[in-house]
Swiss-Prot record:
<dbReference type="GO" id="GO:0009423">
    <property type="term" value="P:chorismate biosynthetic process"/>
</dbReference>
<protein>
    <recommendedName>
        <fullName>3-dehydroquinate synthase</fullName>
        <ecNumber>4.2.3.4</ecNumber>
    </recommendedName>
</protein>
<comment type="pathway">
    <text>Metabolic intermediate biosynthesis; chorismate biosynthesis; chorismate from D-erythrose 4-phosphate and phosphoenolpyruvate: step 2/7.</text>
</comment>
<feature type="binding site">
    <location>
        <begin position="104"/>
        <end position="108"/>
    </location>
    <ligand>
        <name>NAD(+)</name>
    </ligand>
</feature>
<feature type="binding site">
    <location>
        <position position="141"/>
    </location>
    <ligand>
        <name>NAD(+)</name>
    </ligand>
</feature>
<dbReference type="InterPro" id="IPR050071">
    <property type="entry name" value="Dehydroquinate_synthase"/>
</dbReference>
<keyword id="KW-0028">Amino-acid biosynthesis</keyword>
<keyword id="KW-0963">Cytoplasm</keyword>
<keyword id="KW-0547">Nucleotide-binding</keyword>
<dbReference type="InterPro" id="IPR030963">
    <property type="entry name" value="DHQ_synth_fam"/>
</dbReference>
<keyword id="KW-0456">Lyase</keyword>
<feature type="binding site">
    <location>
        <position position="263"/>
    </location>
    <ligand>
        <name>Zn(2+)</name>
    </ligand>
</feature>
<comment type="similarity">
    <text>Belongs to the sugar phosphate cyclases superfamily. Dehydroquinate synthase family.</text>
</comment>
<keyword id="KW-0520">NAD</keyword>
<dbReference type="Pfam" id="PF01761">
    <property type="entry name" value="DHQ_synthase"/>
</dbReference>
<keyword id="KW-0862">Zinc</keyword>
<dbReference type="GO" id="GO:0008652">
    <property type="term" value="P:amino acid biosynthetic process"/>
</dbReference>
Amino acid sequence: MVCVNVELKERRYPIYIGENLLTDTGVYPVKMGDKVMIVSNPTVAQYYLTPVTETLEKLGCQVSHVLLPDGEKYKTLDSLNMIFTALLKENHGRDTTLIALGGGVIGDVTGYAAASYQRGIRFIQIPTTLLAQVDSSVGGKTAVNHELGKNMIGAFYQPCTVIIDTRTLVTLPKREVNAGLAEVIKYGAILDLPFFEWLEAHIDNLVALNQQDLQYCIARCCQIKADVVARDETEKGDRALLNLGHTFGHAIETHLGYGNWLHGEAVAAGSMMAAVLSEKLGDLSYSEVARLEKLLARANLPTVSPDTMQAEDYLPHMMRDKKVLAGKLRLVLLKTLGQAYVASDTDKSLVLDAIRVCSQNN
């Protein structure tokens, strides 16, 4: 087992990474209160709700659960209200702990519920998808979607513990594993060239769910994100760099309808658009763009825009991105592999050109 600590100004919390941790009583916080509510979905619950419940009961907790519909299209205020209703019906108070058992949707909605219920209660992240394990479960971003934009309603609210059991990936569909690798590759591309090079050598093992490589990879991603969050918890500076490909990717998700492309798939295509734009601006070299494209392709990820989208479809969605300031588009781009920056007010004609290069319709 590996433990990565997220060091914040006023407190810290651990991220435990290893095999068979769901049933390890030693990784659960001592201070959970007597009542715990697990939030999950039917897909995850069939595998992991019982072992987690039994482990919590061994710790003396009174455990209940609520199951939300499965999928990005259910990351909504309605799902949030389902959690609130369950908490209120069972008379849960401020001493209750919420546990998010699932992927990024479950983690984001549960975290926002914890931030809001009675003005804040404890919550634990138990991410069961690779994308959630390396990204969304760490750092305290919680949110639900709106029909006009992704993650537009939310809060920064940190978990008290993150428990990452790499064995949960065995039951994950291959498409979901691949989608998680988009966020993994992102970390190397923006901040860690040696890690990017390690991924070039080990990506096939990760696709095959080699446990040793998975644990190293997840721990490295969590450490990179923990370091960034420690410097910039509420995304006023460096944390924005973690959004490589996301402005383009969120446009894809919103335009197609949530869930048609997985988040990681949209981020992969968006990362290629950002890389091509970086090359057009004279930063990234052609060979570096090709390296990124090859690595994404080896992870079975898309590197081009959906065939149903035109370049002009992107900008209306992109202008609603949370990084937009004073009406100016801000994009995460690459100086070189391993070094990212935030570009402000980039020429929109160049943005459109980059999208067209990455289009199936060009």
